[in-house]
Amino acid sequence: MSEVPRFELRSKRKIGKKQKVDIFGDKDDESMLQIDCETDSLISESVSSTHSYEDYSKAYKELTLETPADVNDSASTIVDSVCEESWYDKTIKDEQTKEDKKTDKKLKRIEKVKENNQNDSMSLQIAQLSLRIQRIESETKLKTLDSAYNTIITQADNLTTPQKKSLISAILATMR
């Protein structure tokens, strides 16, 4: 047998070493991040990726070192005057109104379900009664037509020719 030819597609990029990037500027193992680098990738990609991590670490350091500029203003916004309601009371009232609305909605849903159940039970009874009436009507029609048809067929052999003609004319007269 002939050997099956194998095609191997070589990738242009080769996975190289892992590069360690310091995120927070500390020399700890926790702040170090390992990144897979491609050896054949463009130099600008590796420079831009490390540059963005360096920017991130610088921005993080700046944010951690920053302190609020106006401490007095922030403290004055927390403390409310005596005449106004506190934010805690406002939030409690808001939560209570939301809960009241939810319970009202639930009660309305329950009432609608009860009304629908009553309406459904009435409509169900009406549907059952109408089905009974239809069944009784169909049974009585079938009995009368079937019985008449069967008697005609069984006794048609015993009839004379003028009797058969008169039977046919009577049937045609009732069909009009």
Curated annotation (Swiss-Prot):
Plays an essential role in the viral genome replication. Participates, together with NSP2, in the formation of viral factories (viroplasms) which are large inclusions in the host cytoplasm where replication intermediates are assembled and viral RNA replication takes place. Orchestrates the recruitment of viroplasmic proteins such as capsid proteins to these factories. Keywords: Glycoprotein, Host cytoplasm, Nucleotide-binding, RNA-binding. GO terms for molecular function: ATP hydrolysis activity; magnesium ion binding; nucleotide binding; RNA binding. Belongs to the rotavirus NSP5 family. O-glycosylated. It comes from the Viruses. The keyword Electron transport does not apply. The lineage of its organism: Viruses, Riboviria, Orthornavirae, Duplornaviricota, Resentoviricetes. GO terms for biological process: viral genome replication. InterPro entries: Rotavirus_A/C_NSP5, Rotavirus_B_NSP5. This is Non-structural protein 5.
